[in-house]
Regions:
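Surface-exposed loop/linker segments characteristic of extracytoplasmic
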Residues: 1-131
């Protein structure tokens, strides 16, 4: 049987969601927590919610997801740490199948292209819900 893969993941912050501290990440998707727009104090246009990830390093599916086990959270969560499309990065880092950039959905509904050369501090800041 072949299951569909998830090429879009929720943003957990800039910490690796596979690590225990990743559950309490600074992003919008955090284990067993809910956030509303009022919690995104940076402004909706500044907070990344969903982005591309190819699943080349961590084949995944939204079906039957469970947070326990090896790479559990990383199957549906991504994080913004080093930069997009870095070949040597962790499997939870964002990447795409097209060269040069990734597409990111922000909390206000706009989609933005983020280039591979984005400044690391900007890349990390877009992944957190509050300053």
């Amino acid at each position: 049987m072949e299951l569909p893969q998830a090429n879009y993941v929720g943003i957990a912050g800039y910490l690796d969601p596979d690590e225990p501290s990743g559950y309490d990440g600074a992003g919008v998707f955090v284990h067993r927590r809910k956030f509303s727009f009022r919690d995104l104090t940076k402004g909706l246009s500044q907070v990344a919610v969903i982005s591309e990830r190819t699943a080349r390093k961590l084949p995944s599916t939204w079906l039957g997801f469970h947070v326990l086990g090896e790479d559990g959270p990383g199957r549906v969560l991504g994080f913004c740490n080093l930069g997009p499309n870095i070949a040597t990065s962790d499997e939870c880092e964002l990447d795409s199948r097209h060269p040069g950039s990734i597409l990111v959905l922000f909390a206000d509904g706009h989609v933005q292209t983020v280039s591979d050369g984005v400044d690391q501090s900007i890349y990390r800041k877009m992944a957190i819900r509050a300053d």
